[in-house]
Amino acid sequence: MKKTIGLLCSALVLTVFSFGQNNSLIWRVTSDSIELYHPYFNDEFDGTALNSEKWLDRYQWGGLDFKTRMYSAPEMVYVSNGILTLGADTTSTWYEFPDWILDSNQIKKNQVEVKNNKVQLDYLTSVAFSKQTFKYGYFECKAKAPSGQGLWPAFWLYGGEPNEEIDFMEMKGEKQNQMHVDVHCPNKCKFIKMRGLPFVTKRWGGWLKFNQRLVDEWVIYSGIWEPGRVTFYVNGEVVGEYQGDFKTSMHLIANLSIAVKGGPFAPGINKNTILPNSFEVDYIRVWKNTLDTDYQKLKKEVDFGKEDLHVNKPIKETKLQTKKKFMLRRKSLKNELGFVTSMMTNNQQLQISKNGRKMNDITIELIDMHGKVVHSELISTQHGLINLKPFKKGNYILKIKHLKTVNSSTITI
């Protein structure tokens, strides 16, 4: 007799994922292809402090801005209840710094008063700066950006020398339905030639406007960096593509800063800005496709630890309101539909999550090693569970289907 399982929508259920190479997967879905990615790096922020094996709670170069008297302070970073909180506040504290941070040239240039290695600060901000560097992959962050003029959260990659950078997301608290994407690299590589105008170039990047507010909401900001291009997404919708590559491996960063008058991303805070304030991060994940040489070298499980179904942090549908054609040049980008994630929980449940706007025709099949389809389910919800308890332990093929396109991988129950 064929066993059947229902796809269960769940309430606020806490589960534990076994996020190994075989049991946790993400698929990039387009109208004519399904591409499989495997877990490579992650943090679900389940502990009581930032994981020091994965992150620095300061910038490698110190994090003190002498001009603005702003410092990314470790005490502004904390983890609780499955959330990384990156804080920001004003201050008048005299903060003590080690000699290596106190750059004498910067002190002189900005006329900074130093007393016994102490500097009086105006602002405290925060950062989570990965110790590991990455080159290529799918980078994903589920986060809630704060509202309020001058607040400046970001999710980005930074390569140091020669100062290469990919900004998957930068926001301002006063631009409630907008997000900024950008790249930085030497030799004016971000200036692209305009079609039909061979002698005209335009600086890639800029502000994108959405039909829904992004601040104070849970949003998935992500991007795929592959040879020759970087594709940017918001809640699974492609919002931009940079055609070009970067030489260096990069550190992954989430941070909250404060803009100042006359500086980048001005204006600064005003009397209505609520401080202290924070940028909340639910998770940060890096995925690699099967052909990636870094994934081939990994050969170890990636632990996703505790996680819930995220129904207590639902993703509202967003849509790019104003498309910038020079940032969406390839016609095939219209085929991008979003992402489907599968994860095994500790109590033999398979969680399915959809991140995209046009994926009503996604079907999941579970096939035993004899080729028998033991379960087939049309995915109709953003999050759901498939109960695996009725099945014998062993290997199964997990197949994802969209129209005539199919991809699959082996999972272990």
Predicted segment positions?
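Bacterial Sec-dependent N-terminal signal peptides
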Residues: M1-N22
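C-terminal outer-membrane/trafficking sorting elements
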Residues: K325-I413
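Detector for intrinsically disordered, low-structure N-terminal pre-sequences
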Residues: L12-T15, H310, K372-V373, T405
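GH16 jelly-roll
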Residues: Q21-I315
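Residue-level detector of functionally pivotal "anchor" positions at catalytic/ligand-binding pockets or at interdomain
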Residues: T293-N347
